[in-house]
Curated annotation (Swiss-Prot):
One of its GO terms (molecular function) is arginine deiminase activity. The active site is at 399 (amidino-cysteine intermediate). It comes from Borrelia duttonii (strain Ly). Pathway: Amino-acid degradation; L-arginine degradation via ADI pathway; carbamoyl phosphate from L-arginine: step 1/2. Pfam families: ADI. NCBIfam families: arcA, PRK01388.1. Its main location: cytoplasm. Keywords: Arginine metabolism, Cytoplasm, Hydrolase. Gene3D superfamilies: Arginine deiminase, L-arginine/glycine Amidinotransferase, Chain A. It is found in: Cytoplasm. This is Arginine deiminase. It catalyses: L-arginine + H2O = L-citrulline + NH4(+). InterPro entries: Arg_deiminase.
Length: 409
């Protein structure tokens, strides 16, 4: 089936037809113990094995009829046919990497321009070391004081998690303002792809843009149905951003009539809403919550006559909230069945962060064996991928994928 729009995502579970990934690269080898916390990693993955695991992920997707595209290929295609756009991109990338001095900027421009577009993108993501710019010399105070720091531009290891920088909603998407400085550059790629790539330019409405002054991340955005969108108010996404997205969707008269803002704990274990729950079938969700935990949610609706957004606050159990707004009885499968020890461990390794490739079919990390067994007992078809290295980045299959096209349900 051919879709008239290049973006078509009206659910979390419609059969996945096209998805965006990033294959791990040298950026993981430029992580060091002294900078990994600042770059939001708890450990350093072994690149050779991480690539094998990620290729297994991509092969599983392809084996189920999903077209896999890579962000590095899309941005390379975007920049290959117009030198002026390429030059503009290089200048913006260098500026947003925090480079301010004229001689360092010139050296970096020369470095990036003297390689193919594909190599340039790979090296931008990998980061630029002092050894990469062997001909660059500076006797400025700043350079001398920081001479022992090996990187001129930090690597971008979090681009592995393509879900966060931008998120498909309906026929459009949000290009997000990331919460942490280290992830700001990731959204430059989205800006240029959706502005200049021949498939996407002039064809994709933008519901939220990276130049907004409040933060929003894709892991907090869940398309529950054609009518209902859930957004987490978390340590990474601010409440003002939810209102901005809601207003844009309501005013553009997209199908969504209710935006549910879920207030979740601001901690690394609950980094995004999709670490708390994900949808795996029409009425079934995975989650990491206690039986008595109640969520505070804010239901945003639109008053057409006044042009105002109405907000109603509620506090209830997750299954009651989802059941009411989806109009059905909801089943919640807890990580490791809610076991205090195994549940916490499997949540840490993204046991609740599943990727639905069709209703009742999910890709999961094999290491979360107790949760995976429960899924199978509920009749869910489970595709397990290896994850000893990928899991070190604290993101699961949903985090590592950005759906571009899903079948409508």
């Amino acid at each position: 089936m051919q879709y008239l729009k290049p973006i078509n995502v009206f659910s979390e579970i419609g059969r996945l037809k096209k998805v965006l990934l990033h294959r791990p690269g040298k950026e993981l080898e430029n992580l060091t113990p002294s900078i990994m916390k600042r770059l939001l990693f708890d450990d350093i993955p072994y690149l050779h094995v991480a690539i094998q695991e990620h290729d297994s992920f991509a092969d599983t997707l392809r084996g189920n009829g999903v077209e896999v595209v890579y962000i590095e290929d899309l941005i390379s295609e975007t920049l290959s046919n117009d030198d002026s756009i390429k030059e503009q991109f290089i200048s913006q990338f260098i500026l947003e990497a925090g480079i301010r001095t004229e001689n360092k900027t010139r050296a970096l421009k020369d470095y990036f321009c003297n390689m193919s577009v594909n190599d340039m993108i790979s090296n931008m993501i990998a980061g630029v070391t002092r050894d990469d710019l062997k001909n660059y010399k500076s006797d400025s105070l700043n350079s001398l004081v920081n001479s022992e720091y090996p990187l001129i531009i930090d690597p971008m290891p979090n681009i592995l998690f393509t879900r966060d920088p931008f998120a498909s909603i309906g026929h459009g998407l949000t290009i997000n303002r990331m919460s942490t400085k280290t992830r700001h550059r990731e959204t430059i790629f989205a800006e240029y792809i959706f502005k200049y790539h021949p498939i996407y330019k002039d064809n994709v409405p933008i519901w939220y843009n990276r130049d907004e002054d409040t933060t929003l991340e894709g892991g907090d955005e869940l398309v529950l149905s054609r009518d209902v969108l859930a957004i987490g108010v978390s340590e990474r996404t601010e409440s003002e951003s939810v209102e901005k997205v809601a207003r844009k969707l309501f005013e553009q008269k997209i199908s969504f009539n209710t935006i549910l803002a879920f207030q979740i704990p601001q901690s690394r274990a609950y980094m995004h809403l999709d670490t708390v729950f994900t949808q795996i079938d029409h009425t079934t969700f995975t989650s990491f919550i206690s039986d008595d935990m109640k969520f505070t949610i804010y239901a945003l609706t639109y008053d057409v006559s006044s042009g105002s957004i109405k907000v109603k606050s509620e506090k209830a159990k997750l299954e009651d909230i989802l059941g009411f707004y989806l109009g059905c009885k909801v089943n919640i499968i807890k990580c490791a069945g809610g076991d205090l020890i195994h549940g916490a461990r499997e949540q840490w390794n993204d046991g609740a962060n599943t990727l639905a490739i069709a209703p009742g079919e999910v890709i999961v990390y094999s290491r979360n064996h107790m949760t995976n067994k429960l899924l199978e007992e509920f009749g869910i078809k489970v595709y397990q991928i290896p994850s000893s290295e990928l899991s070190r980045g604290r993101g699961g299959p949903r985090c590592m994928s950005m759906p571009l096209i899903r079948e409508d349900i």
